[in-house]
C-alpha cells in the first residue's frame, strides 16, 4: 500500500473563473474528489466524483479527469407583517447587520411581498427596523443565525399597531394650581363614550390606550381617528 485510504493527497482552491486543477503525480489506483468548503454564501456540495487512475496501457501517459460541482446559494426570506403575521406591510425601512455591526443590506418593505437575500454567509445577524409604516410601532431587533443549508431560511418581524393616550392637565385659570375631581368623557366621532377620566390631586388624568388610525384590508394606513374630550363635571367651586 503506497497511499493509505482516505488520505488527502492534494487540496486546491477555485479561481475567479470557478475552476481549479490538481497537478499531483499520483500512483496508479482509485481516487475520489470532493468539495470540503464552499465559497461564502453558498452550500457545500455533497457530491463525490470517483477517479479511475488505474493502468491503461503504455501509450497513455496522462490521465485527465474533469468534475463539475454546483453550489446552491444560501437564501434568507424576510417577512415584515402586522401582529397577526398574515399581512406583509409596506413602508417599513429595514436593515440587516452582521455580527461586526456592518450593514449587509437595507430596503423598504412592499405590500404583499417578502424580501429575499441570497448568498448570505453563515453567521449571526440582526434584523433592524429603522422606521415603521405610519400607524405602527417600531419593532424590537430580531437576531437570527444563518446556517449552511439549501433550504430557504425564514426570518419574521411583526409590527404592533400604534396606540396613544389622551392626557389632561387641569389647572385654575387664575392661580395655576391643579384642580382635582374634574370629570371628562372621551368620545368617538359618533358621540359614543369610550372612556371617563377624573383628575387627581395634581390635576392629571389620562385615558386608556386608544387606536390612532384605521387600516385597509392589506394592513396599510387608511385614515386618522379623531376623538372629542368633553368636561362633564366641574370641581366644587368651579363652573
Role assignments for model-derived ranges:
Residues 1-239:
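Solvent-exposed loop/turn and edge beta-strand elements of beta-rich ligand-binding domains
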Amino acid at each position: 500500500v503506497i497511499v493509505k485510504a482516505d488520505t488527502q493527497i492534494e487540496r486546491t482552491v477555485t479561481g475567479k473563473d470557478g475552476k481549479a486543477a490538481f497537478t499531483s503525480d499520483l500512483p496508479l489506483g482509485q481516487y475520489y474528489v470532493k468539495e470540503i468548503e464552499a465559497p461564502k454564501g453558498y452550500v457545500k456540495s455533497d457530491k463525490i466524483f470517483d477517479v479511475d487512475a488505474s493502468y491503461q496501457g503504455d501509450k497513455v501517459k496522462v490521465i485527465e479527469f474533469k468534475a463539475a460541482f454546483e453550489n446552491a446559494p444560501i437564501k434568507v426570506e424576510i417577512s415584515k407583517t402586522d401582529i397577526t403575521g398574515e399581512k406583509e406591510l409596506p413602508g417599513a425601512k429595514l436593515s440587516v447587520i452582521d455580527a461586526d455591526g456592518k450593514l449587509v443590506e437595507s430596503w423598504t418593505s412592499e405590500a404583499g411581498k417578502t424580501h429575499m437575500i441570497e448568498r448570505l454567509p453563515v453567521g449571526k445577524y440582526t434584523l433592524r427596523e429603522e422606521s415603521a409604516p405610519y400607524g405602527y410601532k417600531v419593532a424590537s431587533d430580531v437576531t437570527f443565525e444563518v446556517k449552511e443549508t439549501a433550504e430557504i431560511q425564514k426570518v419574521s418581524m411583526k409590527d404592533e399597531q400604534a396606540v396613544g393616550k389622551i392626557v389632561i392637565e387641569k389647572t385654575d385659570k387664575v392661580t395655576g394650581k391643579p384642580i382635582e375631581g374634574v370629570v371628562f368623557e372621551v368620545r368617538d366621532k359618533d358621540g359614543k363614550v369610550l372612556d371617563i377620566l377624573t383628575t387627581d390631586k395634581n390635576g392629571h388624568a389620562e385615558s386608556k390606550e386608544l387606536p390612532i388610525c384605521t387600516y385597509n384590508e392589506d394592513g396599510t394606513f387608511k385614515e386618522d381617528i379623531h376623538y372629542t374630550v368633553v368636561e362633564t363635571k366641574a370641581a366644587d367651586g368651579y363652573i
